[in-house]
């Protein structure tokens, strides 16, 4: 019998209460500290939902798009964010990290926040459970989504970020990590192997192919998360427990958990796997908050 476990990660839609509170904050009708407390409280409630719903592994419910890049930028850059930039060819805009010199380890500036940079609130809100994963952007994606000064060597910038990641993992005791790679290079960054060897890594890499993921016998991600069935074959060959995004987070349709289980069982059985992770496509922040909550409850029923 195939063991099926569930994963929830990344951006999560704000409740109506928090959304209205942010509008007040932007009009200076709510102070910075009060909004930060509201956002932290909301994250804690979402984490309780994940746990209650039976989600096996989950990250901090990021409720601000900028938080994908926020921790690394605030930790390592003199001027964390610069101009507004478009994410690929989408309607999503974000404040681009500005890399003016080679990154170095610094102190996390959690309280630094303006309407033009990011919202207030703690960098991470953890429930300290065995289900919790720290969320970090992949180094390839972080660099691709940043503005690099022309005089900098790109490979050296990536190696500098690698040193910061390894220090961060050690300093904060990050035993379990969701490494999010939405904007990867065409060639796999070899420094990732050091990250794989430093923690239990769940690696979400868009556009996964044999050519985009090199192989080493000594280490690898604990779980490589695939976006579709074709990518799942690659994930199964290159990780201990592969994952597949079966739940659609782009529409409000509420899936049948048994049908998702059957799909996961069929895919894993065809490759003679003993275990598989099931998660969602993209992230839930496109959905209304109440629909996202229902999808989480369904996803929890998919896992054992």
Residue map of PLM features:
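Domain-level signal for soluble alpha/beta catalytic cores
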Residues: 1-304
């Amino acid at each position: 019998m195939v063991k099926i476990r569930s994963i929830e990660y990344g951006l999560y839609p704000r409740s109506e209460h928090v959304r209205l509170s942010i509008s007040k904050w932007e009009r200076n009708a709510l102070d910075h500290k009060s909004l930060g407390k509201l956002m932290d409280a909301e994250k804690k409630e979402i984490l309780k939902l994940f746990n209650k719903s039976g989600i096996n592994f989950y990250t901090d419910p990021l409720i601000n798009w900028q938080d994908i890049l926020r921790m690394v930028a605030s930790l390592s850059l003199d001027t964390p964010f610069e101009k507004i930039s478009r994410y690929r060819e989408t309607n999503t805009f974000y404040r681009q990290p500005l890399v003016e010199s080679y990154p170095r380890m610094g102190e996390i500036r959690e309280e630094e926040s303006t309407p033009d940079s990011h919202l207030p609130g703690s960098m991470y809100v953890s429930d300290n459970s065995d289900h919790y994963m720290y969320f970090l952007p992949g180094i390839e994606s972080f660099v691709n989504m940043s503005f690099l000064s022309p005089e900098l060597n790109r490979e050296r910038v990536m190696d500098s970020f690698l040193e910061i990641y390894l220090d961060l993992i050690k300093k904060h005791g990050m035993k379990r990590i969701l490494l999010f790679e939405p904007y990867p290079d065409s060639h796999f960054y070899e420094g990732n192997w050091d990250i794989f060897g430093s923690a239990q890594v769940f690696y979400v890499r868009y556009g996964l192919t044999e050519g985009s993921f090199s192989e080493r016998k000594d280490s690898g991600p604990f779980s490589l998360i695939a976006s579709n069935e074709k990518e799942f074959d690659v994930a199964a060959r290159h990780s201990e427990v592969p994952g597949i995004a079966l739940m659609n987070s782009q529409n409000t349709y509420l899936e049948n958990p048994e049908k998702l289980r059957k799909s996961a069982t069929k895919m894993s059985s065809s490759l003679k796997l003993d275990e598989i992770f099931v998660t969602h496509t993209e992230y839930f922040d496109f959905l209304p908050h109440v629909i996202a909550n229902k999808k989480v409850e369904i996803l929890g029923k998919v896992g054992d």
